[in-house]
Amino acid sequence: MKDRETGKRLLILLISAIGMLAMVGFYAWIWFGFYYPKILIYDIKLYFNGHILILLIYTVILFLFSNLYGGLKIGYLKPMEVFLSQVFSLICVNVMSYFQLALIHGNLIWPVPFFRMMAGQLVFSAVWIYFANLIYRRIFPPRKLLLIHGDRSIEDILHKFASRKDKYNIVKCLGLEEGAEALFDEMEKGYGGVVLWDIPTAVRNKLLKYCYSRSIRIYLMPKIPDVIIKGSEQLHLFDTPILLTRESALTVEQRIIKRCIDIVCSLILLVIASPFMLVTAIIIKLYDGGPVLYKQIRCTRGGKEFAILKFRSMRVDAEKDGVARLAAKNDSRITPIGRFIRAVRIDELPQLINILKGEMSFIGPRPERPEIIAQYLEEMPEFAFRTKVKAGLAGYAQVYGKYNTTPYDKLKLDLTYIESYSVWLDIKLMLLTLKILFRPESTEGVDEKQITAMKQDAQEDDE
């Protein structure tokens, strides 16, 4: 097993190095073939170390963005996700590099070579990802897993793992009724890993320690207490480890820094986005003559209510019956214009005003309507944990989940953010939010047959 992991890491390192060298090679091509000769006209001469520095800066920035967006995660992400990550990384890096060369030149430079380079990089990236993934899958086929489960239906977890057949293959399922000895014997049969699903905490811990002692890989879905403990602070006061879970999610310093970032970024983005907001407002008004903005009561930190602002994407009489409901798949209430602005998130731009006013933050759990929260709280009281921090324009659950992710799973994702908060995490999530704008599944509506708030999920935390 250890040899497999070592080989996998070495292969990914080799594949990543080939991809990085090729991308830097494209940049070196336009640098030496076009931009450096132009600079020489102005008697600006670089020696060997200068050229190395130019290429090194490009390499470091490209690596940082590729690592952030997942552009080097061959075998971990789906090929299309890796390619999309490469696209975002290259756009960010090439825009920054363009202005870097413009500063060296002293004014704006001819951008066509950058466009040619970008086209070449994207073509190479697509070919590189295809063959890299092909080689990776040939050497490292999907892991064969054993699923151990409790009384609850395993249909949901099987569906989740089936969505990644390229990585996982659940070949056998055993229930707890088989008995501990039978489970221990089965786990010893050389599976690529064991999945623990819907198992009482005491039994889960016993299985976990057994697998850990025998170096068996474990996949488990954390419960809410697990997420809280994972984010706790470790103290070294005595001769035994102590974990501290603070009474407030963010410290005073963290709240001040977070608020300063919100004010500065919202002002900058309001200026940049104002032309798009004006055009959107005009189009909505011309379409049906209804109001441009849509106000809705939502809840933020401590359950405090505020009026969230959005560009209207539904018919004026979308909730004429007075019943609060989430958007469903293929919802007939959404207008054609609304469908587009929801897909590219333009409908969310007015919330920059909410952020500037201090009602929301850029990053945090998405604010829910009081009526929806009341429904969730009846079946899952822990849903109130999300209000320990200010609501956000985007959050952990939006980056790593979907619109129709169950409230229980959203809660675990939001708690992961709350318990792991840092300024760097906020910046990282802001950058990752750009990526999900082009991920269709993140804007899916809720399936009418989907069970959204499951009391059974919350009850499992108490077992």
Language model features with spans:
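Membrane-cytosol interface motif
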Residues: 86, 90, 142-157, 291-314, ...
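Juxtamembrane loop-helix boundary motifs flanking transmembrane segments in multi-pass membrane proteins
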Residues: 2, 6, 44, 71-75, ...
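N-terminal hydrophobic signal-anchor/signal peptide
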Residues: 1-23, 27, 130-274, 444-463
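C-terminal terminal-structure detector
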Residues: 382-463
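Signature of alpha-helical transmembrane segments in polytopic membrane proteins
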Residues: 1-138, 438
